[in-house]
A protein has these predicted regions:
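Long, contiguous amphipathic alpha-helices that act as assembly "spine/axial" helices in icosahedral shell
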Residues: 1-21, 49-61, 161-183
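Extended, solvent-exposed, turn-rich assembly/linker loops in the middle of proteins
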Residues: 12-89
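Sequence/fold signature of self-assembling virion shell proteins
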Residues: 28-34, 71-200
Length: 200
């Protein structure tokens, strides 16, 4: 319950930071019902200008922004339900015009910058993560399906028998799991991030 939000926050903020650095991001747009569709289509067109029409795109969108689309009678007509496969898991998501899957993510995980607490430094003993004071709100991130490469590695698992485990008379396991996201330099220009606040 704690790990997945932290991984999401790290990955989305990493993509956003790369887009901002590469100038494939726009800022200063506060989502509103009368302009959101036009803005979204324009950003999709910006990506398609580079990758072409046949490259599948995924739109990772803030849940509060997605709600504007879903709650509007006019805008919701543009949304269809489609199957989205991620690894071996297939699930149903809303998509724009039946083409571009909309992956809705909690707003607290859609910021441009976080402090990831190491659990050791003074003031960081509780671990976890928090948005920094200078972080901005991400409206959406548009990426080709294969541009960001999410990777994870599991370190050697240790198993403790009940005689060794001092916390309970039961077996215990521990392991380290490492996560990262890679975006090859030539692929950054194929991604686009839309941010609520102005970009400096």
């Amino acid at each position: 319950t704690k790990v997945i939000p932290e991984i999401d926050a790290y990955r989305y903020s990493t993509i956003a930071a790369a887009c901002i650095k590469a100038k494939t991001a726009s800022g200063g747009y506060v989502p509103a019902e009368d302009t959101i569709l036009q803005k979204l289509y324009y950003d999709i067109a910006t990506v398609q200008e580079i990758v072409g029409d046949n490259t599948p795109l995924v739109i990772t969108i803030s849940r509060m922004v997605a709600a504007i689309l879903s709650m509007s009678d006019k805008l919701s007509k543009k949304l269809d339900v489609t199957d989205f496969k991620q690894g071996d898991v297939s699930f149903k998501v809303k998509s724009l015009d039946g083409q571009h899957p909309l992956i809705s993510v909690g707003s607290e995980r859609m910021k441009t910058e976080y402090l990831f607490k190491d659990g050791k430094t003074s003031g960081q003993e509780d671990g976890g993560f928090a948005a920094t004071a200078s972080s901005k709100n991400i409206n959406w991130i548009i990426t080709p399906r294969k541009a960001p490469v999410a990777v994870s590695k599991t370190d050697k698992m240790r198993i403790f028998d009940p005689e060794t485990n001092q916390k309970a008379r039961a077996y215990a396991m521990d392991y380290r799991k490492y996560h990262d996201i890679w975006i090859p330099d030539q692929q950054i220009k194929t991604c686009f991030t839309n941010v609520k606040e102005e970009l400096s």
